[in-house]
Amino acid sequence: MKVHATVGNEAIALVYIVETSSGHLVECVESVQPPLPSEKKWVLLVSTMFGCPIGCLMCDAGGYYHGKPTKDEIFSQIDFLVGKRFPDGEIPCEQFKIQFARMGEPSLNLQVLDVLQELPRRYRAPGLMPSISTIAPAGAERFFDPLLEIKQEEYAGGHFQFQVSLHTTDIALRDQFIPVKKWSFAQIGDYGERFYTPGDRKITLNFALAQGMPVDPMVLLNFFDPDKFLIKITPLNPTYRARENNLVSYVNHLSAEQ
């Protein structure tokens, strides 16, 4: 794997632009969560697509789409990041999170399922916790149904994080923000009821909240059981696409870090 660029601060996060075996460029990231040292929590973010076809209003990855990495190309990102810190493949971190959330919509690449099945046997990592972040596109049942089985077989007892990006409870604004066909709140809630079992982490409903994008708790309560779902509100990153679309974060980045 060829590294084309590295940006960031090792004390917080490093972003790598790398070239895969097929000649495509992707981003992958390693990060920590101060004040926790990496021995406590180490987080990797890997790309599941070359760009992204979704076109969310705030996401720079939607500017182009050139296909899907194979299982080996996804693993090459993880192997690269792991090899820099733990070349023997033994990862002693209390929490070793791998987020399939850098570039691309993971549910549109079935190779991600193969990666999830193999992960527990590829590294010696007792703290392993994969994390899938999705917009829940329509027609992705052939990903989500086997994902439920893989979670039960390989990651039961709170070793898996499932996150759905909603961004607002206003349906019309959600359709503008995420301009593709996707599951309704009712469909997401129904899947969550099947996905969650006692001992699991709660399913995260993520809101990268922009000004003017409402979050109505009563709407959420109509579809999502608070015993099985939680709400996460994060700052909207100041991307090129966000600026083009005049999106301003509702949450101040500096206050969110404190």
Q: Where in the sequence are the language-model features?
A:
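Short linear Ser/Thr-Pro motifs
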Residues: 6-9, 47-48, 133
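Canonical Radical SAM [4Fe-4S] cluster-binding loop centered on the CxxxCxxC motif
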Residues: 32-76, 80
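Conserved AdoMet/S-adenosylmethionine-binding subsite of the radical SAM
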Residues: 83-258
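Generic beta-structure capping elements
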Residues: 21, 31-33, 47-49, 135, ...
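A structure-centric signal for secondary-structure junctions around beta-strands
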Residues: 13, 25, 40-41, 53, ...
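Short secondary-structure boundary segments
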Residues: 4-10, 15, 74-77, 99, ...
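Flexible, acidic/Gly-rich N-terminal and inter-domain linker regions that tether
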Residues: 1-42, 54
